[in-house]
Amino acid sequence: MRELAPAKVNLCLYVGPLRADARHELVSVMQSIELADRLELRDHDGPADEVRCEGVEGPNLAAQALSAFRELTGWDGPPQLLEVEKRIPIAAGMGGGSADAAAALRLLARRSGLGSEQQLFEIAAALGADVPSQLRPGRVLAEGVGDRLTRLADPPPFGLLVLPGAGGLSTAAVYAEADRLGLGRSTSELAVALAGLDTSSPEPVNDLERAASSLDPTIEDRRGRALEAGATHAMVCGSGPTVIGLFATPEDAIAGARALSRVGVDARASKPLATSE
């Protein structure tokens, strides 16, 4: 069995105050895009479940998803081998690990015939804030800590330029830097942002951008590169360090990626993934 694990981009990200449980309230419009990891699940001839992901060492969310699925559903099927082909940059603010975990849950539900929508959501929420929103690729409005989701209509076509960083950034480190810089909004300010939000065409705001740029000074150069390539807006994606450029059409984004690639810049064109895809 095979499944795609689409990356996500935060078209806007408003960060609220730090809660008692050390997590932040947020408001974000999240959009799945065509850039995706590829997963394959099959019976394993080994004694236990195994996840293989070239370039990723140690525990990962997909392995945790497999274990949690068995525990919650009681599935006692044969050992499974899950192979992940990475195409989404790692620790890049694009939800690659969360996308893999969500795709693994979809595969396991198909393979076992078990796992209600509520059970999958429960597992996803326990794995991480970004996982529930990626159980069903498309566009969502995320509130709370990313656990209150509202499905949104697919947007008109537009183009995206993805400019990864040379290394990754820890999401926890970026949020800690945001706290140090005092970037979080108050509860009332977050409510104002939500009230004025146009989910069909959100203003490209990322409250974590200053914090990510503080930890990775190369972000500003990549933002400039995206704008030079014709992007109408350029911003940090999620917790970074990836920069995304927004274009009126997918064709414009492809032209921008080609122009940057000619001068040695790692730039990839993509576009939104429709809910039905």
Where are these regions (language model features)?
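Short, basic/glycine-rich phosphate-binding loops at helix/coil junctions
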Residues: 42-56, 104, 125, 196-205
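N-terminal pre-core extensions flanking Radical SAM catalytic domains
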Residues: 236-250
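DPxDG-like acidic metal-binding loop motif
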Residues: 92-118
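Short, well-structured alpha-helical segments that form the helix of a local strand-helix-strand
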Residues: 116-127, 223, 254-257
